[in-house]
Amino acid sequence: MAELKITRENFENEVMKSDIPVLIDFWAPWCGPCRMMGPIIEQLADEYEGKAKVGKVNVDEEGELSQAFGVMSIPTIVLVKDGKVVRQAVGARPKAEVEAMLQ
């Protein structure tokens, strides 16, 4: 399963009402470290299919969502469970560290 593209339109259903954890990658296409994280996010989306949702928010297209999560730097990775942020990491991270957020 490919990662979700999270937008204002699907945010409520895909994130806030999700019955499984949601890992969100706030990114932009012009951001080098964000592009480095892309393959890691894709791998986690495949590996955690059915156990967690993995999605991406393009901060250039979804400024309101970025502001709502207080994103000041990208990439920012946020884990949401039961509609609440439970973990957050800023900057490019190794796969093991991002995966540990899901544990």
Locate the predicted segments by residue.
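Conserved helix-turn-beta segment immediately C-terminal to the redox Cys motif
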Residues: D19-P21, G38-V57
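Structural alpha/beta surface segment adjacent to cysteine/selenocysteine redox centers
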Residues: L65-I74, V80, K84
